[in-house]
Amino acid sequence: MSVTPMNEYPATTLKNVNKMIHPHTYIHPNAKLATNVKVDPFSVIHQNVEIGEGTWVGSNVTIMEGARIGKNCRIFPGAVISAMPQDLKFEGEDTITEIGDNTTIREFVTIHRGTKDRWKTKIGKNCMIMAYSHVAHDCIIGSNVILSNNSQVAGHVILGDWAILGGMCAVHQFTKVGQHAFISGGSLVGKDIPPYIKAGRQPLSYAGVNSVGLKRRGFTIDKINHILDIYRVIYNKGLNTSQALEYLEEEFPATDERDEIVTFIRESGRGIIKRYSKNSVDEDIAD
């Protein structure tokens, strides 16, 4: 994800764009707003903020220090962007929040800037962050991601491109979610979610490959079947994780999908979710 540098935007002063900015808005003199940024009444934009061309900021929005917002974003009333992180170790470091082009941030979303761990919180392009969701410090959210209403994403989480969180999901800190994964509403996510799969039930478990989502993204039937075969080895063949990965590397052709899945699982810090069993215990949120 990249945010267009502000020096590529036409130089704009508040005097030039005052027809787009309501007089009952406060904008710090050092904030940089590109052409055609529209700001509705009672919003506050702090210093060290950059907003790209064509972005709309609704009423009663607070955009705090370190925000870097791309082009054509929509920020709905009540949102708070780039607030200080809720981290007791934070000592006022100069950190930022990056939001990619064409991202929509709905009502009362809160997004916190980074700490010295990553120095930034990053949200990709074309994302939809629905109402009352929270993205904590140092998260890396890919492009085309959807966080449904009241999703709560703790610090240092990584969400891959095209990931979807159902409403009221809670994601444990340092968790990773692979690209094209779908997580059902109300889930507690404490283990890593590999790419291309669905996760559901309690405790959160493997629920099959996200075939519908992959078809919508243009994956061929052959490629989807290849991914299904990979996950049959991981979850249905009776092998432990190490054995399954070795089997995939020895017996399956080297494809981008195979290599991505194997690498994701091998590098998982929290371990991946398991196949559902009636004897499962809720260990997903245990440290």
Map each language-model feature to its residues.
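Terminal amphipathic alpha-helical/low-complexity segments used for targeting or macromolecular assembly
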Residues: 1-24, 29-30, 35-36, 72, ...
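Structural signal for interior beta-strand "rungs" in well-ordered beta-sheet cores
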Residues: 19-205
